[in-house]
Amino acid sequence: MEIRNIKTIKGLFFTCACATLLIFANCGGGDDPVAEEPTLTAAAANALLLDKDWSLSSATNAGTTRDEWTGFTLKFGIDSDLAGGTYTASGIPAEDTDKLVWSTSGTFTASSDLTTLTRNDGIVMTLVVSETALNVSFTVPESSGRVDGFTGAWVFKMVP
C-alpha cells in the first residue's frame, strides 16, 4: 500500500507542477506596448505639404485682383535641415516689372516652422499651407526702388 501512496503522491505532484507551469507561463507581460507613430514637427509637416507643384488660383496687389498672373506656378524645394531651400516660379507675366514681384528662381531661409520664408532678394513671405491650398503673402516695399503698381501687399492663392 505504501507504493500505491507514493505513486499517488508523485502523480499529484506532477499534476500540480504542470498546473503551476501553465499558470505562470500565461502571467505577466501584459499586452505588448503599441509603438506610437512619431509626431512630425511643424516644419516637417509643412515641408511635406509644400512638396507639390502649386498653380495660381488668384493674385491680388493691395486688394486689387491681378489677372495678368493667370498661369503662374510655384514649386518649393526644402533643404533636408528644413532651414531653407529653393523656389522655382513659372508663368510670370511678360511685363519686365512683374519680374520684380517674383523671379523665376531663388533661394530662401525659413522660420523654424516653415511658415515664414525670407527670399534671397530680402522679401519676407508668410505661408499658410494645407493639403488643398497655399496662400503666400508678402509686401514689396517702395524703398527697394520697385516700379509703382508693384509695391505693396501681395497675396498669391495657390492650389495643387
Please give the residue ranges for each predicted region.
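C-terminal motif of bacterial Sec signal peptides marking the signal peptidase cleavage site
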Residues: 23-26
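Lipid interaction determinants
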Residues: 28-103, 111-160
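Small-residue packing motifs within transmembrane alpha-helices
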Residues: 15-16, 51
